[in-house]
A protein has these predicted regions:
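Cytoplasmic-entry segments and transmembrane alpha-helices of multi-pass inner-membrane transporters
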Residues: 1-26, 94-95, 108-109, 113, ...
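Membrane-helix interface segments
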Residues: 1-4, 62, 92, 104, ...
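Generic alpha-helical transmembrane segments of integral inner-membrane proteins
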Residues: 7, 71, 124, 128, ...
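Transmembrane alpha-helices
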Residues: 10, 72, 77-92, 98, ...
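Residue-level recognition of pore/gate-forming positions within transmembrane alpha-helices
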Residues: 12, 70, 115, 144, ...
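Membrane-interfacial helix termini and adjacent extracytoplasmic/periplasmic loops
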Residues: 20-71, 105, 141-145
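C-terminal transmembrane helix and the adjacent membrane-cytosol boundary/short C-terminal tail
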Residues: 83-94, 98, 168-198
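Interhelical loop and adjacent transmembrane-helix boundary motif
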Residues: 139-190
C-alpha cells in the first residue's frame, strides 16, 4: 500500500515541464516506446497484418499523447484526496453492512462511495482548475495541433491571431465557469456528509 502511494506521488516530486519532456522522449518517433516495439517485432507484425510500411508508430502530436500527458500529470491530484478519505473510513460500517447481508457491490455503492465522495469532489476540483487552463502539455505533446482552452487564450495574446479583447473575454468566461463548477462541487460535497443508508 505504501509502495503504491509512493509510486503515485513520485511524479509530483519532479518539475511539471520535466515530466512532460520525459513523455516526449518516450513517445517520439525514435523514442523508447518505438524502440521497444521494433525490438519485440510489433511494428513488423503490424506491417505484415495491415500491409503498411511503417518504420515507427506515430504517437507524438496526437490527441492521445495530450490525454496521456494530462492524465499522468494530474492523476496524483485526484488519487491523493480519495486515498486520504478512504483510509479514514470506519471499517465497522463495512462489517455492519456485510453482517446485514449486503454484497460487495452494495457495500461499495451504499457505504464506501457516499463516504468517499468528499475526497472525489476535492480531487475533481484540484484537477479541473489546472487542467482547464493548461497549454504547455498540448503544445509539447500535441505539437500545437490539439488546442485546449489555454492554447486558445495564449494565442490571442501572444500568437499570430493577436486579439487581446477576445482573449480577455474567453479568460473571464472560463473563470466564471470554473467558479460555478467549484461552487456546485462544494455544495455537492457538503450535501453528501450525511448518514449512510443501508
Amino acid at each position: 500500500q505504501h509502495i503504491m502511494l509512493m509510486l503515485v506521488m513520485l511524479p509530483m516530486w519532479m518539475n511539471f515541464l520535466l515530466r512532460t519532456y520525459s513523455w516526449m522522449t518516450i513517445l517520439e518517433n525514435n523514442g523508447l516506446l518505438n524502440q521497444l516495439f521494433q525490438k519485440i517485432g510489433l511494428i513488423s507484425l503490424y506491417n505484415h497484418i495491415f500491409g503498411t510500411n511503417l518504420e515507427y508508430f506515430p504517437m507524438m502530436n496526437t490527441q492521445g499523447a495530450v490525454v496521456l500527458g494530462m492524465v499522468y500529470n494530474y492523476l496524483p491530484f485526484m488519487i491523493l484526496p480519495i486515498y486520504s478519505v478512504i483510509i479514514k473510513l470506519d471499517h465497522s460500517l463495512l462489517e455492519a453492512a456485510r453482517d446485514l447481508g449486503a454484497g460487495s457491490l452494495t457495500v461499495f455503492r451504499r457505504v464506501i462511495l457516499p463516504l468517499s465522495l468528499p475526497g472525489v469532489v476535492s480531487g475533481i476540483t484540484m484537477v479541473f482548475v489546472p487542467s482547464v487552463s493548461t497549454f504547455a502539455i498540448s503544445r509539447m505533446l500535441g505539437g500545437g495541433t490539439e488546442l485546449l482552452l489555454g492554447d486558445l487564450i495564449e494565442r490571442q495574446f501572444l500568437g499570430g491571431a493577436y486579439n487581446p479583447q477576445l482573449g480577455a473575454a474567453i479568460s473571464l468566461v472560463m473563470m466564471i465557469i470554473v467558479l460555478v463548477c467549484m461552487l456546485v462541487m462544494n455544495r455537492f460535497g457538503e450535501g453528501e456528509e450525511q448518514a449512510v443508508k443501508l
